[in-house]
From Swiss-Prot:
The keyword Coiled coil does not apply. L-citrulline binds at Y85, N121, R125, S173, E258, Y270. One of its GO terms (molecular function) is argininosuccinate synthase activity. PROSITE patterns: ARGININOSUCCIN_SYN_1 (PS00564), ARGININOSUCCIN_SYN_2 (PS00565). Belongs to the argininosuccinate synthase family. Type 1 subfamily. L-aspartate binds at T117, N121, D122. ATP binds at A8, Y9, S10, G11, G12, L13, D14, T15, S16, G115. Its EC number is 6.3.4.5. This is Argininosuccinate synthase. PANTHER family: ARGININOSUCCINATE SYNTHASE. Homotetramer. It catalyses: L-citrulline + L-aspartate + ATP = 2-(N(omega)-L-arginino)succinate + AMP + diphosphate + H(+).
Amino acid sequence: MKEKIVLAYSGGLDTSVAVQWLIDKGYDVVACCLDVGEGKDLDIVYKKALDMGAVECHIIDATKEFSDEYVSYAIKGNLMYENAYPLVSALSRPLIAKKLVEIAEKTNSVGIAHGCTGKGNDQVRFEVAIKALNPSLKAFAPVREWAWSREEEIDYAIKHNIPVSINHDSPYSIDQNLWGRANECGILEDPYAAPPEDAFDLTNALEETPDAADEIILTFDKGIPVQIDGKTYELDDLILTLNALAGKHGIGRIDHVENRLVGIKSREIYEAPAAEVILKAHKALETITLTKDVAHFKPIIEKQFAEQLYNGLWFSPLTDSLKLFIDSTQQYVSGDVRIKLFKGNAIVNGRKSPYTLYDEKLATYTKEDAFNQDAAVGFIDIYGLPTQVNSMLHGGYSNEQ
């Protein structure tokens, strides 16, 4: 009896070629495809996997689990790698790895294969997660092992009658899920080349966006968006709704050269319409619901959390601890944020919360002012005392210092 290998199967070039390669190596291939909100026709993927020679194909709808257990932390933690990338692909990898391990254990497979190259981040994310969840499973990386170029893969697919949706003229590598869309390769590898419009799918070009703005009210409950204009949604449906609405206005395009875990720089084109709107609104709500010290410290945790996720360390003690901290900050992050969507911009123009720490009577400069300005004199004396003592001891500061 042949040994079984579970393959993370997407139906794209890398994994379609990998099926044939694993079969040639003498394995039975168990294909596994997850739906994490990308809108892919999974019936076609299922049929294609079997047509390619897989002995089984498991289709798993993990969209709700993805939104509730993973995207929720991206929102509560305002997660952005290098202050630019909302972790579109990185966010889905630990969930995919988890499901692959479950299928491998269910089918008595000896290992798990993926279609990642040897120069990308995903190989690390998948294999580190798999080792954390089940160290006895072997990892197989066909694309990394054969070290083919993208052009050689395409030629191999053509030679073996493997249907793929890309060609030499449009060799994009695309990954999409509920939280957004990532695109690389082809002309995008030149960091000075303007991305052509065929590199985008979720967002309109600015020239094609409406000339009238849409204004929405996004309601949050403990850090999670739950309503648009008073209508309640499950998180996954809310994100899909915002993707369509914000994408219509050209919101969420990101052109970023990022520092990969493996040490190289990579130019990526991302589309994340809902993510841009939600994260801006969430940050705005936090400005009135978090205390100053938490508001100043939380970004430090957010940066570390984003790097943990980007670097494939979701299943780690540190990440578990970071999640607990993030959760503890969100107890009172509830309320409404008003946002205008227009010509590529998500503009926050109002926020309110039953737990607001903003006191208008303390902030106002009108006659309603309740702030005790006399208290400022003593505060300044105490606050500036260390500087004053230092200056007296060392003779003060000159303009040259």
